């Protein structure tokens, strides 16, 4: 919930289906969960749940539109590859979370972790992670077009 739904970090919901043994889940929760839950975290979950119940479709359409815009702009810079739905082939890739903006960076001569560090240290932009050849930025309901523009501009300058 905190990544995509707008609740505070460290908050989460556990959703179970009919095939999950409720007693076993309760046993594991009792081993790992505190008896003094944070009312701040629980309140943030409730507010986020309410917001998504009332406006979730609209909100996620806006996030998806921002992500697609970012993907197009990053690919237009040159040297980066922000991949998307074109990877879905029905054999090995069946779907794609468009809110996760994964960008290949090696063609600009920098490893993903280097771009990650530059974004953080020089542009004050914190993304999810960088590895040997990619960075991952996760767009959520808390992001605005302004943040997307900052990311795209920073990547253009880094190139």
Specify the residue positions occupied by each region the protein language model found:
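Short, flexible helix-coil linker/hinge segments at the edges of structured domains or between repeats
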Residues: 10, 17-23, 27-29, 77-88
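Hydrophobic residues within well-ordered, non-membrane alpha-helices that form the packing/core
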Residues: 29, 49-52, 74, 155
């Amino acid at each position: 919930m905190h990544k995509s739904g707008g609740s505070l970090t460290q908050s989460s919901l556990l959703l179970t289906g009919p095939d999950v043994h409720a007693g076993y889940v309760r046993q594991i929760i009792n081993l790992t969960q505190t008896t003094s839950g944070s009312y701040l975290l629980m309140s943030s979950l409730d507010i986020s749940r309410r917001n998504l119940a009332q406006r979730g479709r609209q909100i996620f359409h806006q996030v998806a539109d921002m992500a697609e815009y970012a993907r197009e702009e990053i690919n237009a810079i040159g040297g980066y590859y922000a991949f998307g739905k074109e990877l879905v082939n029905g054999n090995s890739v069946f779907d794609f979370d468009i809110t996760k903006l994964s960008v290949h960076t090696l063609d600009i001569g920098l490893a993903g972790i280097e771009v990650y560090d530059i974004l953080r240290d020089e542009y004050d932009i914190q993304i999810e992670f960088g590895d040997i050849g990619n960075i991952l930025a996760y767009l959520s309901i808390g992001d605005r077009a302004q943040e997307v523009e900052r990311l795209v501009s920073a990547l253009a300058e880094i190139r």
